[in-house]
Amino acid sequence: MLKVEMLSTGDEVLHGQIVDTNAAWLADFFFHQGLPLSRRNTVGDNLDDLVTILRERSQHADVLIVNGGLGPTSDDLSALAAATAKGEGLVLHEAWLKEMERYFHERGRVMAPSNRKQAELPASAEFINNPVGTACGFAVQLNRCLMFFTPGVPSEFKVMVEHEILPRLRERFSLPQPPVCLRLTTFGRSESDLAQSLDTLQLPPGVTMGYRSSMPIIELKLTGPASEQQAMEKLWLDVKRVAGQSVIFEGTEGLPAQISRELQNRQFSLTLSEQFTGGLLALQLSRAGAPLLACEVVPSQEETLAQTAHWITERRANHFAGLALAVSGFENEHLNFALATPDGTFALRVRFSTTRYSLAIRQEVCAMMALNMLRRWLNGQDIASEHGWIEVVESMTLSV
């Protein structure tokens, strides 16, 4: 199996001053291309350290993706490190120098002398185009390893990997079929509770069951070779049965996007009134393109479930909205939710202890609860579902 590794560079990455989103993206992208990473390393802006790890990994990896260090400043050392590791010098790539000059000219800017450095590549390097920036990439062969050097800017990095590097890998190596990965996301049940039921399932050869907990959701993943797809799809029915009502969506699209699409398909507009969630619902749904009307965030106040239900019913009528959704303030571990629809208004009062969680997490939980109510109504289900750690203490319905 092809051994693919990644090397992230830069003091800011090494010291945790920025999150290495490029590494996470590459690992996921390559995994779904049948190229799972076998190792990831991070090195700071130190020439000796860079040269050392390039030489070291060249003895073990078949492919190494090096990210960062291609800029015009003194701490951008990747090209020099590659040349030093190979025992050769840097040469000026005249065509890229002209391309950079054109890039700046089209934007009404003068290229700084320091940018010339970005056109200096190891003598044996293969040039890799960057159509969206000034940091070209390059590839070198060092011992057994084919190394690709890429820019640190995420938008440039992704374009280069997808359109330049992956085609080269497919041309040079015989790549396996991408693995099959079935995913669903649950809300309201603990990871241990799900695992207790799912761990008894008999998995096909080479297939693994994975869990990813990110409060307030848990993602279940069944991953395996393409040759086992039929068996995995059969097993997936058992996984969904065990997860039961806690399943809120399948795949990776996300609940706000799925709700947005359903609202649009059914030509429902939605108005929101938020207290405890502080506009989080509006943010999530607007980013997904949901058909929102007037949305409000009001200070938290104590109110009965009946008050919340009557208020959101009036709001739906006043704004001529198809649907209206309300989240009350959070008082003494209690919270109200209400959804006004053409069929009537449905309201829940819930209790859950959240002292161990931050305010941001508590707001995420409440936003997910509200979205799940909306999802269930759109799917023709009762708005309340069983949640192991959220107790429904009161419910009511207002007729149309």
UniProtKB/Swiss-Prot annotation:
SMART domains tied to this protein: MoCF_biosynth (SM00852)
SUPFAM superfamilies xrefs: CinA-like, Molybdenum cofactor biosynthesis proteins
InterPro entries membership: CinA (IPR050101), CinA-like_C (IPR036653), Competence-induced_CinA (IPR008135), MoaB/Mog-like_dom_sf (IPR036425), MoaB/Mog_dom (IPR001453)
HAMAP family found in the cross-reference section: CinA_B
Functional summary from the UniProt entry: Does not have nicotinamide-nucleotide (NMN) amidohydrolase activity.
Family to which the UniProt record says this protein belongs: Belongs to the CinA family.
Name the UniProt record assigns to this protein: NMN amidohydrolase-like protein YfaY
